[in-house]
Curated annotation (Swiss-Prot):
Binding site for heme: 483
Organism expressing this protein natively: Penicillium rubens (strain ATCC 28089 / DSM 1075 / NRRL 1951 / Wisconsin 54-1255)
Protein topology in the membrane: Single-pass membrane protein
GO cellular-component term (any): membrane
Sugar attachment sites: 460
Transmembrane segments: 50-68
Keyword list, A-Z: Glycoprotein, Heme, Iron, Membrane, Metal-binding, Monooxygenase, Oxidoreductase, Transmembrane, Transmembrane helix
Full protein name: Cytochrome P450 monooxygenase prx8
Gene3D superfamilies in alphabetical order: Cytochrome P450
Cofactor annotation: heme
Function, in words: Cytochrome P450 monooxygenase; part of the gene cluster that mediates the biosynthesis of PR-toxin, a bicyclic sesquiterpene belonging to the eremophilane class and acting as a mycotoxin. The first step of the pathway is catalyzed by the aristolochene synthase which performs the cyclization of trans,trans-farnesyl diphosphate (FPP) to the bicyclic sesquiterpene aristolochene. Following the formation of aristolochene, the non-oxygenated aristolochene is converted to the trioxygenated intermediate eremofortin B, via 7-epi-neopetasone.
EC number(s) on file: 1.-.-.-
Length: 540
C-alpha cells in the first residue's frame, strides 16, 4: 500500500517515529528498481524474439532458394494472358490461336502453371529435331510439368531412367511388332467378348470406359503377358494409377512448394498413386524374379517386363520399385492416349456414318486377297482409308494442344541469332499447325480421306501416314524426339477399330452430331458422358 506524507503533516506530528516514515520510501524505491529491471528484461526478450523470427525467416528463404527452380532470363517475346491473368492451360486453344495468328512466324510465350513456355515457329524445327537430350531434355520437362517427384508420373521419381523404357520400345517392341500381331488380335477378340454385351439390338454403352479396359487388356498382354495381363487386380491397378496421377498433379501444385512433400500423406489422390505402386510391386515381384532367371539362362518372355530388365542398368535391375514403376508408367501412357484416340475416331464415325461402308469394303477386299486370320504387320499398312480417317480424326481432335515440349539444358543459338537459355521450356503449337489454312485445304472441315488423296499424288506414297512425322505433322513429335511407341499404338488402335467396324453398327443416342471435346490442362479430351449405341451386325 502506498503512503504519501506531506511536509505539513510531518511538521504537526513531532512525535512520529522517523523509521516508520523512511520504510515506505525504501519500499517504493525498491519497487521502482524492480520495474526498471523488468522493463529491461522485456526489452531484451523482444529483441531475442525479433532475432529468432529473423533467423527463422532467413532459414525459410534459404530452404525455398534450395528447392525453387532456377528461373531463366525472361524471353523477349509477347506473353499471352486471358481475362483473369496468366493462362494455366485450361481452355487454352483460343489463346494459342490468337498467338499463332498475331505472331505467325515469330515467338510468343505462355505463362503456364509450371513456368513460362516459349512457343516456337516451325522454321526452327529442323535445327532442333536432332539435338541430343543433354541440350534439350524431355525428362526434365515432364518432371516439372507433372511434378513427378510427388505424383510418380515417371520412373525418375523412384530413381530410374525414362531412357530405359524408351530403349525397350525402340529396340525390342517396335522391331518385334510383326511377331506380336497375333497376340494383339487375340486379346482384342477376348476383350470384346468379356466387356461388350451381345448387342443383338441397339444397346447403350459408356464406350470410353469400355475402351479404357479394352486397351488395358490388349496393352497388358504385350507389357507383362498372360496370365497376369488378365488378372483383375493388375488391371484395376494400372487403370486407377492412370486416373489418379492426372487428378493428383493440379492438387499437388496447389500446395506451397515447401510443403508438397506432405501431399503423400494428406492428399487422397497421391496416397492412391503410392498404393498402386505398392500393389504393382507385390504383383510383379514373382514375375520379375522368374524373368531374371530366364534371361540369365538365355531365354525369357517377349514382353516389356523382360525388355525393361534387359535394358536396365544394375541399379534399375536390382530395384523392384523401379521395375514396378516402369510397368505403371508404360501402361499409363498406353491407356491414356490410345483409349482417347479410339474414342475420338468412334465419335467421328458415329457422327459421319457415310464413312463406315467404305472402311468395311477396304477391309473385306484386303481379306479376300490376303485370307489371314488377322491383319499382320505387312497387311495393316494397306488399309489406307482407315489410316487416313484416323489421321484426320487426330488432326481435329488432338490429345495435346502443344507438342515437342522440351526443357533447355544448354544454351542453344538458333539460326536467327536468338539464344534459348538453360531452364527455358519450349513447345510448338501442334493444333494450330494442324489447322493452318496455309498448309491444309479447308482445315476446319472434316475430310476422312484427306490424307489418302494426298498420298495418291506422285511422290507422296510414304508421306501423310498416321505415324508419319514432319514439320507439319507433329502429332507424334519429330526427328529423334518422335514418340517411339507410335507404331505399336497405331497397330493396336487399328486392330480395335477394324474389329468394331466389322462386327457392329453404331450411332449416337439421338441426333446430337459430333460431341464437343472437353478442354483439360493441355488438350482435347472426348466427353466421357457421351453414350454410344451398338448393334451387332448380321454377317452372311
Amino acid at each position: 500500500m502506498a503512503v504519501i506524507f506531506s511536509s505539513s503533516a510531518l511538521g504537526s506530528h513531532t512525535h512520529v517515529d522517523r523509521h516508520l516514515v523512511r520504510q515506505p520510501i525504501r519500499d517504493l524505491e525498491n519497487n521502482v528498481d524492480m520495474l526498471d529491471h523488468l522493463s529491461r528484461v522485456l526489452a531484451l526478450s523482444s529483441q531475442y524474439h525479433a532475432l529468432g523470427a529473423a533467423i527463422a525467416l532467413f532459414a525459410c528463404a534459404c530452404a525455398y532458394a534450395l528447392v525453387a527452380p532456377r528461373q531463366p532470363p525472361k524471353f523477349p517475346a509477347p506473353q499471352l494472358y486471358d481475362e483473369t491473368g496468366p493462362i494455366d492451360l485450361i481452355a487454352l486453344d483460343k489463346t494459342i490461336k490468337e498467338g499463332f495468328q498475331n505472331y505467325k512466324g515469330k515467338y510468343f510465350t505462355l505463362k503456364e502453371a509450371h513456368g513460362e513456355t516459349v512457343i516456337l515457329p516451325t522454321k526452327f524445327m529442323e535445327e532442333l529435331k536432332a539435338l541430343p537430350d543433354n541440350m534439350l531434355n524431355l525428362d526434365d520437362e515432364i518432371d516439372e510439368r507433372f511434378l513427378s517427384e510427388y505424383s510418380l508420373f515417371t520412373t525418375t521419381s523412384v530413381g530410374g531412367r525414362i531412357s530405359t523404357v524408351v530403349n525397350s520400345i525402340k529396340n525390342e517392341l517396335t522391331k518385334t511388332l510383326g511377331n506380336l500381331m497375333g497376340d494383339i488380335h487375340e486379346e482384342v477378340v477376348y476383350s470384346f467378348q468379356e466387356l461388350i454385351p451381345p448387342c443383338d439390338d441397339w444397346t447403350e454403352l459408356d464406350i470410353q470406359s469400355k475402351l479404357v479396359h479394352i486397351v488395358a487388356l490388349v496393352s497388358g498382354r504385350i507389357f507383362v503377358g498372360l496370365p497376369m495381363s488378365r488378372n483383375q487386380e493388375y488391371l484395376d491397378c494400372i487403370i486407377e494409377f492412370t486416373l489418379n496421377v492426372f487428378f493428383a498433379v493440379p492438387e499437388i501444385r496447389a500446395y506451397p512448394r515447401l510443403l508438397r512433400w506432405t501431399s503423400r500423406y494428406l492428399n487422397t489422390k497421391v496416397r492412391a498413386v503410392h498404393k498402386s505402386l505398392a500393389t504393382m510391386r507385390r504383383l510383379m515381384a514373382p514375375i520379375i524374379d522368374d524373368t531374371k532367371q530366364q534371361l540369365e539362362m538365355g531365354t525369357g518372355p517377349h514382353n516389356m517386363c523382360a525388355w525393361n530388365i534387359k535394358n536396365s542398368n544394375q541399379k534399375e535391375r536390382d530395384s523392384l520399385n523401379i521395375q514396378a514403376q516402369m510397368q505403371l508408367a508404360t501402361s499409363m501412357a498406353a491407356i491414356h492416349t490410345t483409349s482417347m484416340t479410339v474414342t475420338n475416331a468412334i465419335f467421328d464415325l458415329a457422327a459421319r456414318p457415310e464413312y463406315l461402308q467404305p472402311l468395311r469394303d477396304e477391309f473385306q477386299d484386303l481379306r479376300a486377297i490376303e485370307p489371314l486370320p488377322y491383319l499382320d504387320k505387312t497387311s495393316m499398312p494397306k488399309l489406307r482409308k482407315l489410316d487416313s480417317f484416323l489421321k484426320e480424326s487426330h488432326r481435329l481432335s488432338p490429345i495435346s494442344l502443344l507438342n515437342m515440349r522440351r526443357k533447355i539444358v544448354q544454351p542453344i543459338t538458333l539460326h536467327d541469332g536468338t539464344v534459348l537459355q538453360p531452364g527455358m521450356h519450349i513447345a510448338f503449337p501442334l493444333h494450330q499447325i494442324s489447322n493452318d489454312e496455309d498448309l491444309w485445304e479447308n482445315p476446319s472441315q472434316f475430310d476422312g480421306f484427306r490424307f489418302q488423296k494426298l498420298r495418291d499424288l506422285p511422290g507422296n506414297e510414304s508421306k501423310y501416314q498416321f505415324t508419319a512425322t514432319g514439320t507439319n505433322n507433329l502429332d507424334f513429335g519429330h526427328g529423334v524426339h518422335a514418340c517411339p511407341g507410335r507404331f505399336f499404338a497405331a497397330n493396336e488402335i487399328k486392330m480395335i477399330l477394324v474389329h468394331l467396324i466389322d462386327n457392329f453398327d453404331f450411332k449416337f443416342k439421338g441426333d446430337i452430331g459430333r460431341p464437343d471435346s472437353l478442354w483439360t490442362p493441355g488438350g482435347y479430351h472426348p466427353d466421357p458422358s457421351v453414350r454410344v449405341l451398338l448393334k451387332r451386325r448380321l454377317k452372311a
